Every structure is written in structure tokens, then in C-alpha cells.
Design a protein with these regions (language model features):
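Intrinsically disordered, low-complexity regulatory segments
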Residues: 1-169, 173, 350, 468
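Conserved short loop/turn motifs at secondary-structure junctions
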Residues: 1-3, 110-111, 188-191, 269-278, ...
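Basic, low-complexity terminal or inter-domain segments flanking catalytic cores
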Residues: 2, 77, 81, 125, ...
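Amphipathic alpha-helical transducer elements in NTP-driven molecular machines
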Residues: 9-16, 33-36, 40, 59-62, ...
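Accessory interaction regions appended to the cores of large information-processing enzymes
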Residues: 17-23, 47, 53-55, 154, ...
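C-terminal or mid-to-C-terminal helical accessory/interaction module adjacent to the motor/catalytic core
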Residues: 87, 100-101, 142-225, 269-270
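Metal- or metallocofactor-binding catalytic centers and their adjacent structured scaffolds
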Residues: 244-280, 286
Length: 684
């Protein structure tokens, strides 16, 4: 008898059908020599500190570093603390019996780091010694499952994947437990949550927020002139230089305004080739879905997982944007399946010979890029179809021809001032045919040459301002997590450094959602805005190692090395233990920042707590409320008296000393809105 374990019941049901295990029992299917059972996520996890006899938050217990981690069934929170989930215990009992009674286990959990850990933790907790093989597949179609079952791999082949997963799990426990307890002890009240990846991610959101809010725009002035060619084409030239001095710009403008001609000093024409975009991995799919359709990262992952389980796409939690040669051989057949879908048939038929930019087996690790399986979608919701069509569209783009443009740049001299004009004409649409060109052609006369004189038919002087980097969206935050905050646009360069990012494609959505759940960040349209609680925490930890984005990226790189067999997981464990001790010490030492004064001010939100006055924030002492009111507003720190007035009356009087983004001082009333966030009210 063989036992197959899947990650969730729906997958187990499909596998059971294929192997002929058609009889339903409590917690498994059976028949034809197979038992097919399932987990539902992590059934087993490392024990909380209570599992090692450590209760409560006490500085003398820190850092908590177990010599060996104890595994326990998944816990649920109750009024009396944590206890094992009854449903989990019941399923573990079923799995234990099946594992111990069978001759061979077939591991069919998701083919990735977390899927491996789900099984290995369970196997270790049970104390099982039954040999196991690995079902490693990239889609859940009947064909893929059957081929995978014919080509099972020895379970030990994935030991390094398990070591990396286990190292990640233990590192998150060590950093999360110790950092959370240390900063909570330092604060003296409430509970703050910190994490190995969560905190650097919050730091990126807060840093961008402050860069945006504290940005001082600079005014600039730019000259322009227009000329009309004999064929009727009107071309606009812009001055290369942008002038800070308005009077100097106006003086130059008057010169241009008073002249009738300009001389072309340089005409450069060249052919520009735009490579096809690479196929989607999970992160780029999430970024595009957010920027184009407003989907959250978590929403996109959930839909992609649903499409995968519906056999419509390949494994979504991939970090690769490439496919191997054997998968490429199937692409013509997959494109042919699209001829039955009117929206895509014309585009699919236009691809006579798929191009190879996304084909590189050396850049495929556990799973290749996300592609369709050839199964036809039926009864999908609008949201599900949107993600499916994005994957189809990207496949069509990736296997189309390159886009070729004729690009022209003309430089002109007018009154000693250098002006430029740029033109671009699509010569061959290639992959841009799929969605259409994103910009219209800009035509420049093709008979212009160096030394030619053009007529100045019009001139103008415009004024603009420099702009700050925008607040992070989920799309830009995912990009920053992928590259540790480095601004990299090139697809291939992003792929080259993806091991240095923070988090993994499979975990980044959950990390972002954690920031919302902790009350550190909120959504404002598409933008991510830190709350006062998030900013207050950032202020405390921003210079500490736990908020160091680059260091977190180095840990992720080490985990990738463990997975490839290039690093011993024990060396990683020693390093993370040292790091844990360091950050715990740093966080415990920040008590002075959290020093506070008691007050008799009642919390305006909950009506029961008392407000405590800290250096940078005033906060409610009711643990169920914890309302934070950040002191700094537009470059001004509110005094204790001003804060008391705000808390007591819901608003202050007119206060002076605020400074706008442009650096101008202004006066305003600070008041609460309906959610007890602060806002400015301007006196009439």
C-alpha cells in the first residue's frame, strides 16, 4: 500500500481520482493500492516560548534561543492561551496511521520550499521512518500528474530544499519572537510586532513616505519653439537646459521670441530594437495586476493559486521568468489552443515561429515561468479571467517578434541656446501588436540634415516643479522587495539579483498584508501610507539592524545558497543566532526612547484609557485601543500643552510654525477626523 499526501483536500481529490482511490474515508481516499490524504497548510509548527517553559515577557529570558526546536500541532488562540487545533489533531492522527501502515509515502505537497516543509515537519513530528518519494510537477493537469507519478524522484533529492525551508522557519521564529518581546519590554506597554522581513519592509514604506512629505520642490523654467515643415508637420523643440532663475529664463525667451530661425546642429537617425518582455513570474504578475487593475498582491496570488488548482496555469509561486527547452517544445501546441478564443485567436495565429528570449534552462530552478496549460477556462469570475488573460497576453508578447522603431533626435541652435526634438516611428510592431503601441508615433521630417535652417513659427516659456518620488504602491513595494530597494528597470538584471531580495515570491504578499493587519500601514487609493503607529515604530528602529534592508537581503541570499547546496544550514543557524542576540540587545536598549509621562487625559477614542506622553508620540494605555497620536506635523513638533488641547477638545487653537512642502510657513488648526487621524483645518 502507498500513501500519497497532498497539501490540501482539493488536490488530494484530483490525485485520488487519477490513481483510482475512489472510496472516501474519514480524512483520506482509498482504493487501487493507494491511500490519498491531505494536510491543510502547516499542520505542525515550532512551539512558542511556552513550549520551552518560558512564560510572559521578561528581559532576563532574552534572547530565547532553543538548542533544538520542538514541533507541536498548529495552535489556536483561546481565552486561556494557545492550544492545539482540534481539527488539526484529528487529521494528524489519520496521517500518522496511514504513514506507519504503508510501504511507501509519495509526497505531493506543493513543489516548493513551503510545500516541502509542510511534509517534513509532519514526518519529523510523527517520528516516521517509512521511505518517501517526491512528486514534483509544475501543473495539476491529469497529464502532468500521470507523468509525475511515472517519474517519481527520491525524496532525499530535496533535502537541501528542506534545510533552506527549515532554516527560514527557525530564523523567522528567532527574530520575530525575540524582537517582538524586546521592543515590547522597552516600550513598557502594549505589544509591538517585529519580524525578519516585516520590519525592513515597513522601513521601506516609511522611508519613502518621509522622502515624499519632506521633499521641497524646486521651480524651473524651460524654453520651447515650434517650427512647421513644408509638408505641414509641426515639430516642437525644448531647451536642453531647465533654468532656476526666472529672470534669466525670461531674458533668453525674449531673444528666441525675437528671432525667425534656428540652425540644426545635429541629426541622428537610428533603428531601435525593443526586446520582447520575459514571461511572468509571480512578482511581476502581482506588480502588473496592481498597477493595471488595482489588485492587491494577496488577491493576485489567491487567484493564481485558484487557476493553478483548476489546471489552467502552471505553478504560480515561481521566481523564474524563463522556461526550459522541453517546455518550449510545447509552446506551439499551447498557442494553438488559443485559436478557439476569439479575443486571442488573431494574435495567436500571427505567431508563426515562437521566439526564444524567455528560453534558458539554466535560469529555471524549481519551477519555470507561469504559462497556461492548454485547458480551456470555463465559468471564471471577471477577476479570475483578468489574471488568466494577463498570463495569456504575456505569453503572446514573449513569443512574438521584437518591436523595431526608427528613432530620430534633432539638435538645434537658436540664439546660442541648445534645443532638442525627438521622434519615434514603429517600423515593425512585433510584440507590441498584442496590446497595441503604448505611445503614438512622433514624426520628424526625414529630409532634415545638419546645417539646415528652420523657421521659428512660435515660442513659449513654461514653468514647472521638480516632483518627489511617489508613495509606494504594492507594485513598487514588490519591486523594491525584489531588489532590496535598488531602482532596476531591466528585466534581465532584476532576474540576476533576485536571490538578493527580501522575502520570496511566495511570501511577499503575506508580508505586505501583515503590515496592514498590525495597523502599521493603510491603503489610500493605490498608495501605501504608514499610520502614526507605523511611523512611531519606524522612528525607533530605523537605524537598527532589524530594519536593515540590505542585511535582510543577504540572509535571503544565504537561504538560496542552502537550497542549492552551496552553504551548510548550520552555519546559517549560527549567524542568525548572533544576529538575534545583537538585535535583541539593540531593542532592549531603546527604553529611553519609549520613556513617557503619565497624564489624566482620557483617550478620545475608547473613552477608558489614559494617554501617555512619549517623546515622539502620545498613546492610549488601553491595550485594546492603543490610539497613537504622532507629535510631528508638517515640520513642527506639538508641545504637551498643544497635545492635551487636541485630546481634550478634539482640536487645537490656531498654531504657527508649520512648513509646507514648498518650504513656506503656515498656520493651521490640528483636529481629529472621524477615525481619530489628525488633519489640518485652515482658519478663514
Amino acid at each position: 500500500m502507498k500513501t500519497i499526501i497532498a497539501e490540501k483536500p482539493s488536490v488530494a481529490r484530483e490525485i485520488a481520482r487519477i490513481v483510482g482511490a475512489t472510496e472516501r474515508e474519514e480524512g483520506y481516499f482509498t482504493g487501487n493500492g493507494y491511500n490519498v490524504t491531505w494536510a491543510f497548510g502547516h499542520l505542525v509548527q515550532p512551539a512558542l516560548p511556552e513550549g520551552y517553559g518560558i512564560r510572559g515577557f521578561h528581559p532576563e529570558n532574552l534572547p530565547i534561543i532553543p538548542q533544538v526546536f520542538t514541533l507541536v500541532p498548529r495552535q489556536v488562540k483561546t481565552d486561556k492561551g494557545y492550544k492545539a487545533d482540534a481539527g488539526v489533531m484529528k487529521q494528524i492522527k489519520v496521517i500518522t496511521r496511514l504513514f506507519n501502515e504503508c510501504d511507501k509515502i509519495i509526497v505531493a505537497t506543493d513543489a516548493g520550499r513551503e510545500g516541502e516543509l509542510i511534509f517534513r515537519y509532519l514526518y519529523e513530528y510523527i517520528g516516521c521512518a517509512t521511505p518517501f518519494d517526491r512528486l514534483w510537477i509544475s501543473s495539476l493537469t491529469d497529464k502532468a500528474i500521470r507523468e509525475g507519478l511515472k517519474n517519481l524522484e527520491c525524496g532525499s533529492k530535496y533535502d537541501n530544499l528542506y534545510y533552506a525551508a527549515k532554516a527560514r522557519s527557525e530564523a523567522d521564529w528567532l527574530v520575530g519572537i525575540n524582537a517582538t518581546q524586546a521592543i515590547t519590554l522597552a516600550a513598557g506597554r502594549g505589544t509591538y510586532s517585529l519580524g525578519r522581513v516585516q520590519t525592513p519592509t515597513l522601513a521601506m514604506v516609511c522611508k519613502r513616505f518621509w522622502e515624499n512629505k519632506r521633499f521641497t520642490p524646486e521651480t524651473f523654467h524651460q524654453l520651447h519653439f515650434g517650427t512647421e515643415h513644408k509638408d505641414g508637420t509641426v515639430v516642437k523643440f525644448d531647451s536642453e537646459e531647465k533654468y532656476k532663475d526666472k529672470s534669466a529664463a525670461e531674458e533668453l525667451y525674449n531673444k528666441v521670441k525675437g528671432t525667425r530661425s534656428a540652425t540644426l546642429t545635429k541629426v541622428v537617425r537610428k533603428e531601435k530594437t525593443e526586446d520582447t518582455p520575459l514571461l511572468y513570474d509571480l512578482t511581476t504578475l502581482q506588480k502588473d495586476a496592481n498597477s493595471k487593475h488595482g489588485f492587491t498582491a494577496e488577491q493576485t496570488l489567491a487567484i493564481a493559486q485558484k487557476l493553478y488548482e483548476a489546471k489552467l496555469i502552471t505553478y504560480p509561486r515561481t521566481g523564474s521568468r524563463y522556461i526550459s527547452e522541453d517546455v518550449f517544445a510545447e509552446i506551439p501546441k499551447l498557442l494553438q489552443t488559443l485559436k478557439n478564443r476569439p479575443v486571442w485567436s488573431l494574435y495567436a495565429l500571427s505567431i508563426k515561429k515562437p521566439t526564444r528570449r524567455s528560453v534558458d534552462g539554466s535560469k529555471v530552478t524549481d519551477h519555470h515561468a507561469i504559462i497556461i496549460t492548454g485547458e480551456l477556462p470555463k465559468h471564471l469570475s471577471n477577476e479570475d479571467m483578468t489574471i488568466y488573460d494577463m498570463i495569456v497576453g504575456r505569453m503572446l508578447e514573449a513569443f512574438s517578434e521584437k518591436c523595431i522603431k526608427d528613432v530620430t533626435q534633432v539638435t538645434a541652435d537658436c540664439c546660442g541656446i541648445i534645443f532638442t526634438a525627438k521622434g519615434s516611428v514603429i517600423k515593425k510592431e512585433g510584440w507590441r501588436y498584442i496590446y497595441g503601441a503604448d505611445k503614438k508615433d512622433v514624426l520628424l521630417p526625414d529630409d532634415w540634415n545638419e546645417g539646415d535652417t528652420v523657421t521659428v513659427n512660435s515660442s513659449s516659456l513654461t514653468t514647472g516643479q521638480t516632483k518627489p518620488k511617489p508613495l509606494h504602491t504594492e507594485a513598487s513595494l514588490l519591486a523594491a522587495m525584489e531588489t532590496c530597494g535598488k531602482d532596476i528597470e531591466d528585466d534581465e538584471m532584476r532576474q540576476a539579483i533576485k536571490d538578493c531580495g527580501i522575502g520570496t515570491p511566495a511570501t511577499r504578499a503575506a508580508i505586505i498584508e501583515t503590515l496592514f493587519a498590525r495597523g502599521y500601514v493603510v491603503r489610500a487609493d493605490k498608495s501605501l501610507v504608514p499610520t502614526e503607529k507605523g511611523l512611531a515604530l519606524y522612528y525607533v528602529v530605523k537605524e537598527m539592524q532589524i530594519a536593515d534592508v540590505a542585511m535582510t537581503g543577504e540572509w535571503e541570499q544565504s537561504l538560496a545558497k542552502i537550497e542549492r547546496g552551496e552553504m551548510d544550514d548550520r552555519d546559517f543557524r549560527r549567524g542568525i543566532e548572533e544576529y538575534t542576540s545583537l538585535i535583541t540587545s539593540e531593542l532592549l536598549s531603546c527604553q529611553k526612547i519609549f520613556g513617557h509621562k503619565e497624564s489624566e487625559c482620557t483617550c478620545p477614542k475608547c473613552g477608558t484609557g489614559k494617554m501617555q506622553f512619549f517623546h515622539k508620540v502620545v498613546r492610549c494605555d488601553n491595550k485594546e485601543c492603543g490610539l497613537p497620536i504622532f507629535r510631528q506635523k508638517a515640520g513642527k513638533d506639538l508641545t504637551d500643552d498643544e497635545m492635551k488641547e487636541l485630546i481634550t477638545n478634539g482640536k487645537t487653537g490656531v498654531l504657527k510654525g508649520f512648513k509646507s512642502k514648498q518650504g513656506k510657513k503656515f498656520s493651521a488648526i490640528v483636529a481629529f477626523d472621524s477615525d481619530f487621524n489628525t488633519q489640518f483645518i485652515f482658519p478663514k
